[in-house]
Amino acid sequence: MSLEDSLRSLSLDYLNLLINGQAFSDVTFSVEGRLVHAHRCILAARSLFFRKFFCGGSDPSASSGLIDQTGIRVNPSGSPRSSNGVLVIPVNSVGYEVFLLLLQFLYSGQVSIVPQKHEARPNCGERGCWHTHCSSAVDLALDTLAAARYFGVEQLALLTQKQLASMVEKASIEDVMKVLLASRKQDMQQLWTTCSHLVAKSGLPPEVLAKHLPIEIVAKIEELRLKSSIARRSMMPHHHHHHHQHDLNAAADLEDQKIRRMRRALDSSDVELVKLMVMGEGLNLDEALALHYAVENCSREVVKALLELGAADVNYPAGPAGKTPLHIAAEMVSPDMVAVLLDHHADPNVRTVDNVTPLDILRTLTSDFLFKGAIPGLTHIEPNKLRLCLELVQSAALVLSREEGNANNNPPSSTTTTLPMYHHPMNDDHNSSSSSGNNHNIANLNLDSRLVYLNLGATVGSGQMSDDHGGRHGDPAMYHHSHHDY
């Protein structure tokens, strides 16, 4: 066993203590009316706050009290006890979800500071949201950061800062300003620099910023804008290039602002605003990578509405890799996205610069899943979704191949019947009405792919799939790539 495997095993063993609740527990916390069982020795070893808290007195009952907003410990008379006789410590400084994340990090040294994908959240109205950079995800990260600072867990604070720095690049400007305020309050210079530059580039006038930020922060943003403008002018080598360079910079800033406004509109499902930007401001959806962004970060309904505008090329290759939206959807293993793209004539045979098709991506993922038990780069995957994505793309490729064959075999004057791009039962109102179409598609699949489907289903269904840690099983949620190389 390697050192990495040994540490991972140790981490899981400690985490199991927390998961098993009352097993060997000698301290219980009450958070938002719910009991959380823990172990003093682990908390004291991992957090200076808890070490001081538990060493408050020689009498065990003296270490029980209220962890309130000010960090003051109080010993109320008649403190309640849990079922195992251990005194219960009320916690009012953080919420239940954040407290569990904090304990998870203290026990295992690792934690995912992201809400569950597609989970209904009180401050996120987007149905099917991935919660990668929405207001709910930002709020959870900010609450976790505050808790990490409060309980003196600096490693968790640093981890959360990195998470927030990644989130704000795609977050709405309102959420960026929330992070900006938190970074200033908690003296996080790097996060402050990132957020202040994003707010400065947003193009929002000072009077609008003043509604969300203290006046001294607005002044710093304006100072930053002024310095940025002076720096751009000082970089111009010759006077006669001044106006030309200034115009180029202004145009680049304007395009950047357009793209940010477009992304905020897509995040809030406001496709009508995007339509107005296309018609009134000349926004180029392909150059702005609107469809790529929507596939990766928005719901199926938003992607469908964006495609129906008719202003975006569904097969547009983006970035040095040349990935199309269908490549992105295949990497995400998202049947909804794959289906809506194929519905709007996405090409299943389109290739990247490296000569990779969406079908190649799904076949590789399936092969890795079958023969390795896990997919490199993905922490979790739902086999049924992988199988459905593969079926959709392979069926579309097969139909397209037949159409091309018919066109080559028939003279131009002959009349041929054009088959639909593919048939997808997810788009029908009643599954029963599409059973014949499904059977037709599945019958056309080649033997190799059919064996892949059977093996994938049999492996998962029989519970024979295992991993390096003794074959743990569960119903994993699909992992979503938060960044793509396009």
UniProtKB/Swiss-Prot annotation:
Disruption phenotype: Defective in stipule formation and impaired organs abscission in the spontaneous mutant abs1/Abs(-) and in mutants Delabs and Abs2(-) associated with the lack of extensive cell wall disorganization during senescence. Slightly reduced separation of root-cap border cells from the root tip. Zn(2+) binds at C124, C129, H131, C134. Pfam families: Ank_2, BTB, DUF3420. Its main location: nucleus. Residues 466-475 have a biased composition (Basic and acidic residues). PROSITE patterns: ANK_REP_REGION, ANK_REPEAT, BTB, ZF_C2HC_NPR. CDD domains: BTB_POZ_NPR_plant. ANK repeats lie at residues 257-286, 287-316, 321-350, 354-388. The keyword ATP-binding does not apply. It is a peripheral membrane protein. Signal peptide: none annotated. One of its GO terms (molecular function) is transcription cis-regulatory region binding. It is found in: Nucleus; Cytoplasm; Cell membrane. May act as a substrate-specific adapter of an E3 ubiquitin-protein ligase complex (CUL3-RBX1-BTB) which mediates the ubiquitination and subsequent proteasomal degradation of target proteins. Transcriptional co-regulator involved in the promotion of leaf and floral meristem fate and determinacy. Necessary for the development of stipules at the base of petioles. Required for the abscission of senescent organs, probably by regulating the cell wall disorganization in abscission zones (AZs, e.g. pulvini at the base of leaves). Promotes slightly root-cap border cells separation from the root tip. The BTB/POZ domain mediates the interaction with some component of ubiquitin ligase complexes. This is BTB/POZ domain and ankyrin repeat-containing protein NBCL. It comes from Lupinus angustifolius (Narrow-leaved blue lupine).
